[in-house]
A protein has these predicted regions:
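C-terminal motif of bacterial Sec signal peptides marking the signal peptidase cleavage site
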Residues: 16-19
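Short beta-strand micro-motifs enriched in acidic
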Residues: 76-78, 104-108
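Short beta-strand elements
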Residues: 201-213
Length: 233
């Protein structure tokens, strides 16, 4: 009887610890991400996400600063270095200033959606094992020798699905949806020269944590009051 009691006590301790760890992890994740993963649970995903992180199906849309100055980024290379870390490199552009950057993306959590949808007319039903997303931290350092360089830090959320062959694929199942987005980055940029920080975010189709910048219903559309900040065509 005492062995059974001890086993139950140990199980409760383990479950309590796991619950505390999950709550602690969630406490560090930005609210904008938590709101997008509410219908999901922790999962394991032994996969190389390089193909998703380097996706170029559409260019990134981004901003920097409280005036929502247009920010462009081209992620040119992504290479997995261990189970949860990726080396990345590319180019950023703000106004006429270009910088090269290198850095890392570290996956902190993989999640599986508990009530996945199946696309238009359920066309993807039976075509995948599960749909999910990954939460990651990023640290991207622009070359210090270049004018206007700095360091980007923040969180990233990207979506995937595992097909019936066990391959993890860029999730565009809901691309017909007005709110569809993928590869969402949001955080800050800190100037190497002044050490001052600015908000900075970018993503595919939509931009996370962007206040009233995007007023589009069916697709991204810039608020006219910010058009002069690099958004005019």
């Amino acid at each position: 009887m005492s062995k059974l009691f001890n086993s139950l006590a140990l199980l409760l301790i383990v479950l309590s610890f796991a619950s505390c760890q999950e709550k602690k992890a969630e406490a560090n994740v930005p609210k904008w991400i938590l709101s997008m993963v509410s219908d999901s649970k922790n999962t394991s995903a032994e996969a190389d996400f390089s193909n998703i992180l380097s996706d170029k199906s559409v260019p990134y849309i981004g901003y920097i600063g409280t005036d929502y100055q247009k920010f462009s980024i081209d992620i040119q290379k992504v290479q997995r270095t261990d189970d949860n870390q990726y080396n990345v490199s590319g180019i950023t552009v703000v106004k006429n200033n270009r910088c090269n950057f290198r850095g890392t993306i570290d996956i902190v959590e993989n999640r599986e959606f508990t009530h996945p949808t199946y696309g238009v007319d359920d066309s993807m039903k039976g075509q995948f094992k599960r749909r999910g997303c990954s939460i990651a931290k990023y640290n991207l350092e622009e070359e210090t020798s270049q004018t206007g360089s700095g360091v980007f830090t923040g969180y990233l959320l990207f979506y995937w699905y595992e097909n019936n062959d066990g391959k993890f694929v860029y999730d565009d199942i809901d691309s017909h949806s007005d709110s569809y987005c993928n590869n969402q980055y949001a955080g800050t940029w800190k100037s190497n020269k002044t050490k001052k920080s600015k908000l900075c975010a970018w993503g595919q189709y939509r931009v996370p944590n962007s206040g009233d910048l995007d007023i589009g219903a069916g697709e991204f559309s810039v608020n006219p009051k910010y058009a002069k900040n690099g958004w005019e065509k």
